[in-house]
Amino acid sequence: MKQIAIVVLAVLVMVSLSLSAHALKPTKVEVLYMNHGPLMSTVKQIKDALSRYGDKLSVSWHDFDTSEGEQFMAKKGLKQHVPLVIWIDDSPVATVGAKKVEFVGFPTGSGPAFFQGKWTMDDLRTALDQVTAKK
């Protein structure tokens, strides 16, 4: 009976440690962007927003116009010309409140109308707040 209790306790400790390690893992954020004029103010706003989360995020930036950026696009299956995509834990779509938000293109109201997405910086901050709340 004592051995069973020790085994059960050991299993509980291992499960607890693995859950704790998972909870501490930073949220992965990947940003594909075009490194030129019209997008630069948006990139600055995104960097400012991401900096609020410190080590709760693991952020990587990929310049659309470089060979590394092209490889990243291929890895993500992107073939179209898009100025900006933000993936949060491997998805460009997040549920923000009751709506699905896709972080593609310029934020609403900024940049050329043709390239505007249907998201705002507030949507991005809210999505990041949600995924980092438990970290």
What does each model-identified segment do?
Residues 1-5:
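Positively charged n-region of N-terminal signal peptides that target proteins for export
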Residues 7-16:
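Bacterial N-terminal signal peptides
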Residues 17-23:
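Sec/Tat signal peptide C-region and signal peptidase I cleavage site
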Residues 24-53:
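Local sequence-structure signature of Cys/Sec-based thiol-disulfide redox active-site neighborhoods
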Residues 31-37, 61, 72, 109-118:
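Second-shell loop/turn segments in exported
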Residues 43-50, 66, 70-73, 121, ...:
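Extracytoplasmic/secreted envelope proteins and their assembly/folding machinery
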Residues 55-69:
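Thiol-based oxidoreductase modules, predominantly thioredoxin-like and allied folds used
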Residues 87-135:
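Non-catalytic, surface beta->alpha helical segment in thiol-disulfide oxidoreductase systems
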